[in-house]
Structure formats: C-alpha cells, structure tokens
C-alpha cells in the first residue's frame, strides 16, 4: 500500500521548467546521508553549529562543510547570533520534500536494497 502522502500528484502541476542538470544537482545536495541527517535535525527547530556537531557525531569542520552546502543550495538559512551561527529551514516545502522522500523510500525499500547501480552508505561503486 502506498503512503498517504503520495495520494496527490504534482506531475500535472504548472511549475517553472528547469534544466535536468539543475534538478539533478538539487537532489545531489541531499544525496549525502550526513547532510540529510543534519537537515532532518534542523527541520525540528533552529540549531547551532555545536548542536549539529553533537547530533551528527562527526568533527566540527566536517559538519561545517555539510551545513555550508545546505545553505549554499538554499535548503537551510544561517543567521549570526553573537559568536554563534544558528541554522533554520525557512521554506516549508523542504519539510514536505523530506517527508515525501522518506515515504517513497519506505514504499520502495526492497527495490532500493536490491539496486546495485547506486551504492549504499559506506559502499563504493
């Protein structure tokens, strides 16, 4: 049974056309498990860099690289609060996108597990 979040379809919606390379790049920004983990954490509320480091369980420089990517790609906003940077998601469609992706991944888990063309976390092609 398909997830309820997939009941509607945007396939016929009127949206601005983007080049396939732009859309692929949009998804590549989320293709890293650490970035996705950080994004899901930030979706639950504004976070500092230190909170993101603790949550991700990796070094501050690595978290900084991932957060910079999320900011540069427009998924996350950063604001300075004294010496701290605080990260948040301003566009509610980002939460919708992540939820849709999770629903699709759950619905297609068996196929994704069998897919040999896209490596899983820690695997190399």
Curated annotation (Swiss-Prot):
Residues 49-68 bind DNA. It comes from the Bacteria. The keyword S-adenosyl-L-methionine does not apply. Residues 15-109 form the HTH arsR-type domain. InterPro entries: ArsR-like_HTH, HTH_ArsR_DNA-bd_dom, HTH_MetalResp_TranReg, WH-like_DNA-bd_sf, WH_DNA-bd_sf. GO terms for molecular function: DNA binding; DNA-binding transcription factor activity; metal ion binding. The lineage of its organism: Bacteria, Bacillati, Actinomycetota, Actinomycetes, Kitasatosporales. Negatively regulates the mercuric reductase merA and the organolyase merB in the absence of mercuric ions. One of its GO terms (biological process) is response to mercury ion. The keyword Repeat does not apply. It comes from Streptomyces lividans. This is Probable mercury resistance operon repressor. Hg(2+) binds at residues 69, 73, 114. Keywords: DNA-binding, Mercuric resistance, Mercury, Metal-binding, Repressor, Transcription, Transcription regulation. The gene is merR.
